[in-house]
UniProtKB/Swiss-Prot annotation:
One of its GO terms (cellular component) is cytosol. Belongs to the methyltransferase superfamily. RNA methyltransferase RsmG family. It comes from Moorella thermoacetica (strain ATCC 39073 / JCM 9320). Keywords: Cytoplasm, Methyltransferase, rRNA processing, S-adenosyl-L-methionine, Transferase. This is Ribosomal RNA small subunit methyltransferase G.
């Protein structure tokens, strides 16, 4: 715990983001549940508690440095896996109306267990593919923000995320040092899908040297009805 507390103190000094004791307790409970489930379901390759804090929890929170999120914003985490970053964002900002979208049912079962265990309200766990859910009236162009971490390249990710975002809203992709290059290569695809203004936030993970880029895209036009294409196509044949 001393290592964790030192890490949190350093993160707070670096970013100005400070977790409350009750939030730390909730994330510790989540971490315990994650490691227990991970013995049966492949949720994370990181099994050291301090590294979970550093590479999953604190990394997720960098979003709040990249973009000001208004109160009670509607947020969807696409390809959330074990709930990263969406679950962490919700714990830090309980006012957010959060949806966690995951295509693997076993992982959705874990997410539902985690949400129930932590007593979180205003959070929905969705089982399905972005290509299908993004066409449903209840979800299409209804979110202020769509986020995704480590799911796909920017061409593909834009087709997964932008159909969920309302005009004027944003998508944010968590990327490493190659993020800006991916963004440049995906410029036309982003424009086709309704994206407009683009920005790159640059930083690094507290306690390490890993470079982090958050790709921020504002949606300026409705996504054409033909997108997203049928399941599998955005990954197999990314828009160019």
């Amino acid at each position: 715990m001393r290592d964790r507390d030192r890490l949190l103190a350093a993160f707070s000094k670096d970013t100005g983001i400070t977790l409350k004791p009750e939030q730390i307790a909730m994330i510790e409970a989540y971490t315990g549940l994650l490691l227990d489930y991970n013995q049966r379901v492949n949720l994370t390759a990181i099994t050291d508690r301090e590294e979970i804090w550093r590479k999953h929890v604190l990394d997720s929170l960098l979003l709040f440095l990249a973009l000001e999120i208004p109160p009670a914003a509607k947020v969807i985490d696409i390809g959330t896996g074990a709930g990263i970053p969406g679950l962490i964002l919700k714990i830090y900002r309980p006012d957010l109306e959060m949806a966690l979208l995951e295509s693997q049912n076993k992982k959705v079962a874990f997410l539902k267990k985690a949400v129930a265990t932590l007593g979180l309200q205003g959070i929905e766990c969705l089982w399905g593919r972005a290509e299908d859910i993004g066409r449903q009236k209840n979800y299409r162009e209804s979110f202020d923000l769509a986020v995704s971490r480590g799911l796909a390249g920017m061409n593909t990710l834009a087709e997964y995320c932008l159909p969920f975002v309302r005009v004027g809203g944003f998508m944010i992709a968590y990327k490493g040092p190659g993020g800006e290059g991916e963004l440049n290569a995906a410029a036309r695809a982003i424009e086709i899908l309704g994206g407009g203004t683009k920005k790159v936030w640059r930083g690094s993970l507290t306690g390490g040297q890993e470079v982090r880029q958050l790709i921020i895209i504002q949606k300026e036009h409705p996504t054409p009805p033909v997108y997203p294409r049928r399941p599998g196509l955005p990954a197999k044949r990314p828009l160019q």
